[in-house]
Amino acid sequence: MKKIIILSIFFCSFSVKAQDNLLNLLSQDNEPIYITYLFKSTKVVNGQSVELPSKGVLQFTIQHRFGTLNSGFYNLYGLDNSQVRLGFDYGIKDFLAVGLGRSSTTKTIDANSKLRIKRQIRDGFPVTIVANFAAYVKQWQYTDNQLDNFLFTNQLSFAHQLLIASKINRDLTLQISPTMIHYNLVETLDEPNDKYSLGLGGRYKITKRISVNAEYFYQLNDKINNNVLSFGCDIETGGHVFQLHLSNSAAMFDRAFIHETNGNWLDGDIYFGFNISRVFTLNK
């Protein structure tokens, strides 16, 4: 009798444990599988991608742009002319990051924040959505006579973007970027303060560590300058991402390359450049 009772207790406990394991497996099966690594970098080429630094990770980026290739051998096809942007991006949360940078030629300081609203899910939600907000201020040198007419707010401009990307398959990612940029001060009365554009971009992986990227921004209500078209190649080497670029814009922040591009591909106004990114884990 005792043996029967002991065996009954054993089988009951085993049955309960097996049922718990089965429920755990079913629960795990119901958990969403998020799609990651849509791009290798926080940039597609010049523009922002849906990628953010992870929580507690600081990303340091050196961006370098040379002169136009059609400047001739005397300027070594643009290599004698260069400008630099230094940028820092930090992940506050896995869904929230902030950034700060400065460009040498235009003397512009830019700050931005990126908020991930929704993530692509395997066999579920088809896209990743990120909101990007940025502010820009141009540094000026002015004399005492100009100080009375100088307004700091006139040097400010702002960008609002919705970055929507989808990883179509293991190699191909596409992104669309509706953008609005506001200028506090414009040059003429006919020029709008609010300028709208639509960005299209994508990347295709050639190998595990190398991808080719392309990006185009079409200006919807501002026809003063040219639309920017850029091509790039991303090379991942451990903790670094090395990016090579060709573009008709030398600018390295959104406001400038979207709405202030004068270069024309057909005229040979092509700028070569590169980015080097390094990440540091500050807080796990």
Which functions belong to the PLM regions below?
Residues Q19-D148, L156-H160, A165-I176, M180-N184, ...:
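Transmembrane beta-barrel domains of Gram-negative outer membranes and organellar outer membranes
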